[in-house]
């Protein structure tokens, strides 16, 4: 049985001799041939060579031509920022910069890099006749967001008719791209629409379903297979996705595989995923990759399932980790060996973040896969960038790309489970949802207010007036009361001590009175029992 036949049977929901395996090699294939991402994604020759090397190393049943959700956007006038280890990121939105929808035309093969992708598809089809060739296209909602920007979320409420018109145009672009990839020899059209994770089922059915139903119907009429790719916290949309007419749903690690299995089987469609991209494939060891692959196989079963990464493979993914997955797929004995391995992988070291967020400034942490490679991550980072100037000098923000181990440790230490996520002073606030500007500002301001209140509470103090009653003591008390009135403070407790033994406790002798001693209180712990070692550090400051 060829890989192509295996994929076709899996799409039909039938049992195969083994589960088919499709590594989503995009710019990672560039690394395999020594090319950076920009050079790779601009060259049909390099794409052809990179895919050939990936096929040789990873022994797949199917392979994507390319994995770049900016191809259509670039052809339609979006400005791109290129990187050496990631696909490009959209940096400007034509419909937000004076261009109208009437000005746009469905791009042809001569537009942007579309011709490069199609030429690569034709060569890959010819070079690998036994494999299922995937042609990824940008989904209409993600393309619409590239063209308009995050303003689309407000327009869905304020001007739904405009959004429908924009999505209809993006549908036509997707139909054109799908047809061109099919004519170039692709067996599977993968409609990749990660930004749908930002909307709920009702909005999905209102805006996305009508468009993608037409796309999947057209793909089916041309004799090709279709897959709906989604990433992020999109579990709520799986049931409506399954009713769009797609032949397969492919997910990442944010969605439980068992949930997708049940939903897809209800609708008699196949499903794929969801090897962990960063913690396992990028940062783990071959044994970690094999354990993860085996766990996916055990959950998914043997019918209608395609083993794949959760999304486009990171550029620097160690080839040995993907080769280890291929061993699990191809060798039943290897699967048995991995099952028998008793040693557990060591837990990731965790940071002690109990005191995190106690500094004067508010810290906004954005946990991402990589804002240069992941569209939802990019738009979440952009949302924070846009509001940060409102809090200059008060708020600091930083992105934590979990493709780096230290960021992964930080993520697990904060108990973050999904990306992208915004945390404010260590508290998870926005999970896989790009907050509107006003909502984000309100969340940051709320934390600023909380810190201000805590600072006031922690700065309470007592003034001890030492000495017998006298004219000077009366004058001293009057001066203190006037100072408090002028400052508008009432948080200072005033206590008068006139006994010699009480005065002596402060190191003051009778001849030095009247004297004033100020004792300031600092809150050191709330809602927890601090450890002895922590208390010792406090005592050292006394």
Which positions does each model-derived feature cover?
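Glycine-rich loop at the start of a catalytic domain that most often binds anionic cofactors/ligands
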Residues: 32-38, 72-84, 413-417, 509-511
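Non-catalytic, surface beta->alpha helical segment in thiol-disulfide oxidoreductase systems
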Residues: 424-453, 519-542
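Thiol-based oxidoreductase modules, predominantly thioredoxin-like and allied folds used
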Residues: 393-407, 489-502
């Amino acid at each position: 049985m060829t890989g192509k036949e295996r994929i076709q049977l899996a799409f039909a929901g039938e049992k195969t001799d083994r589960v088919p395996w499709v590594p989503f090699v995009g710019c990672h294939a560039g690394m395999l041939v020594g090319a950076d991402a920009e050079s790779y994604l601009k060259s049909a020759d390099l794409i052809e060579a990179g895919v050939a090397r990936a096929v040789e190393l990873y022994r797949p049943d199917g392979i994507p031509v390319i994995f770049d959700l900016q191809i259509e956007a670039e052809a339609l006038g979006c400005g791109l920022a290129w990187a050496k280890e990631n696909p490009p990121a959209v940096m400007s939105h034509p419909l937000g910069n004076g261009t109208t929808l009437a000005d746009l035309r469905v791009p042809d093969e001569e537009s942007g890099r579309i011709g490069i992708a199609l030429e690569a598809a034709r060569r890959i089809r010819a070079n690998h006749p036994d494999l299922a060739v995937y042609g990824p296209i940008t989904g209409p909602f993600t393309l619409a967001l590239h063209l308009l920007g995050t303003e689309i979320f407000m327009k869905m409420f304020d001007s739904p008719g405009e959004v429908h018109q924009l999505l209809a145009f993006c549908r036509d672009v997707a139909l054109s791209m799908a047809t061109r990839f099919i004519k170039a020899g692709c067996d599977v059209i993968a409609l990749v629409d990660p930004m749908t994770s930002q909307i709920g089922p009702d909005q999905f059915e209102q805006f996305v379903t009508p468009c993608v139903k037409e796309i999947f119907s057209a793909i089916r009429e041309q004799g090709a297979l279709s897959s709906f790719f989604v990433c992020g916290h999109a579990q709520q949309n799986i049931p409506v996705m399954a009713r769009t007419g797609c032949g397969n749903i492919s997910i990442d690690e944010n969605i439980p595989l068992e949930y997708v299995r049940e939903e897809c089987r209800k609708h008699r469609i196949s499903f794929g995923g969801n090897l962990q991209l960063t913690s396992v494939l990028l940062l783990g060891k071959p044994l970690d990759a094999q354990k993860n692959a085996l766990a996916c196989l055990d959950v998914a079963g043997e019918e209608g399932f395609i083993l794949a990464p959760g999304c486009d493979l990171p550029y620097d993914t160690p080839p040995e980790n993907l080769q280890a997955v291929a061993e699990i797929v191809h060798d039943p004995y290897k699967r048995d060996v991995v099952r028998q391995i008793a040693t557990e992988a060591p837990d990731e070291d965790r940071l002690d973040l109990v005191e995190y967020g106690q500094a004067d400034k508010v810290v906004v942490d954005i946990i991402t896969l990589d804002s240069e490679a992941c569209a939802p991550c990019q738009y979440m980072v952009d949302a924070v960038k846009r509001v940060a100037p409102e809090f200059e000098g008060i708020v600091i923000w930083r992105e934590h790309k979990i493709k780096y181990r230290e960021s992964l440790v930080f993520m697990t230490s904060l108990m973050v489970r999904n990306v992208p996520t915004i945390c404010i002073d260590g508290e998870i606030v926005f999970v896989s949802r790009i907050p509107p500007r006003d909502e984000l500002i309100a969340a940051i301001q709320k934390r600023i207010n909380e810190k201000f209140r805590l600072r006031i509470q922690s700065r309470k103090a007592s003034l001890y007036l030492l000495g017998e009653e006298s004219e000077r003591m009366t004058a001293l008390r009057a001066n203190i009361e006037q100072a408090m009135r002028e400052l508008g403070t009432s948080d200072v407790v005033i206590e008068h001590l006139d006994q010699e033994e009480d005065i002596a406790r402060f190191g003051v002798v009778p001849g030095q009175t009247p004297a004033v001693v100020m004792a300031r209180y600092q809150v050191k712990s709330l809602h927890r029992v601090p450890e002895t070692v922590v208390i010792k550090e406090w005592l050292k400051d006394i």
